[in-house]
């Protein structure tokens, strides 16, 4: 459950109790709004005593003195004014949200002395608040005081010089928060609740936003020849699904942009079973599908001027008497045959059929797939960057730029013939793993064999989609990584 902020923007705020939040840079003598909130100079005295230097994302919490117009004052440090980025405004909003406790109304003075604060910055600050307050407590029957208060409504007035512009920009912020938090919800859901059929039903709910949604059943996928995807699913009693989402916000003649997500709702590893320790985290092996679903929610909610396709392959990978075996050979939708060496390298088998289907049907401008694909990428990049693999330099540059802008950072990894040959098979056209060395790269090469000449990028988000370190705007196990990144890519380069 998320805290319910009723956010509005104004040139001034009526201060009668509640909380006032002020922002201060290291190079300003005082915080914006200080003369309104603190005519007696309590902030300066408290800062001196606490040695508060306004270091980036630091906070000073003050109980207002008798006779003040508010009950509490929080000053948030921003560091140097000249160094402020869009992501800093998000972080400041998250830092502020964490300080809003035991109050039903808050005024935030967002303008920074000596620097013009844009409407976009005010909206980013508000977005940071919405992202920070997300929590997933659906299944808790007993909640502590903070959890009980999280569901209560708090009125937040953000004081800025351009409230009309901020309000307009904030409509996009609300759309983004909705998509990110949808992705987080999907990743956090327990696997007994969210199977392939249930996930597909969640995608179907996007129809209320104007998205066209088709759900392919096992019978339909078999007719298309999706033997790779179906091979993964055959060990589970829960039938697979392929959800196809279309947002038609661009011109009718414009080719769509396409996003494909791995949706393994639970991954035991199959017959090549994983160790028991930590297996519960494999409910998050559908983080790619969650991100694609969240992205489609954003694009429709903000009425993006683009044609976009989102496709998610939904399966459960289980050991069973009917499960796929190491040594099996399956035929993909492309007609290429695959020797299954390791049933725990299943995500690429799901993606290869979904990508081929997408390319064959929609002829998109590009395809970007997202997947919690390999542990090897976590070893290489940790939880800071997601791995980027691509056959197109322009698309890679655009993605890298969007990653820096949103702080959902990517690091481009190499591709080449010397890696590609590692997945050649003696018995089929290819095998589904190239061994322990260069595991993330050989996985990417496997996927690359199914994209033909279409510009393509593969984002390995195994280290960033779940269990990544908590920060100012994310306190959730499932982070929603990829939603803001890809929305920024579309916004910056592909809207008509």
From Swiss-Prot:
Protein residues bound to Mn(2+) 2: 262, 267, 285, 346
Keyword Cytoplasm tagged: yes
Residues annotated for Mn(2+) 1 binding in this entry: 267, 344, 346
Keyword Protease tagged: yes
Catalyzed reaction equations: Release of an N-terminal amino acid, Xaa-|-Yaa-, in which Xaa is preferably Leu, but may be other amino acids including Pro although not Arg or Lys, and Yaa may be Pro. Amino acid amides and methyl esters are also readily hydrolyzed, but rates on arylamides are exceedingly low; Release of an N-terminal amino acid, preferentially leucine, but not glutamic or aspartic acids
Any one Gene Ontology cellular component term annotated for this protein: cytoplasm
Function as written in the Swiss-Prot or TrEMBL entry: Presumably involved in the processing and regular turnover of intracellular proteins. Catalyzes the removal of unsubstituted N-terminal amino acids from various peptides.
One Pfam family matching this protein: Peptidase_M17_N
Swiss-Prot/TrEMBL keywords: Aminopeptidase, Cytoplasm, Hydrolase, Manganese, Metal-binding, Protease
Gene name of the encoded protein: pepA
Enzyme class at the top of the EC tree: hydrolase
NCBIfam families: PRK00913.1-2, PRK00913.1-4, PRK00913.2-2, PRK00913.2-4, PRK00913.3-5
Subcellular location field: Cytoplasm
EC number: 3.4.11.1, 3.4.11.10
Family membership noted in the UniProt record: Belongs to the peptidase M17 family.
Active site, per annotation: 274, 348
Molecular function as annotated in GO: manganese ion binding; metalloaminopeptidase activity
Native source species: Rhizobium leguminosarum bv. trifolii (strain WSM2304)
GO biological process: proteolysis
InterPro entries assigned: Leucine_aapep/pepB, Macro_dom-like, Peptidase_M17_C, Peptidase_M17_leu_NH2_pept, Peptidase_M17_N
Coarse class of the protein's main subcellular location: cytoplasm
Cofactor note: Binds 2 manganese ions per subunit.
Cofactors named for this entry: Mn(2+)
Listed name of the protein: Probable cytosol aminopeptidase
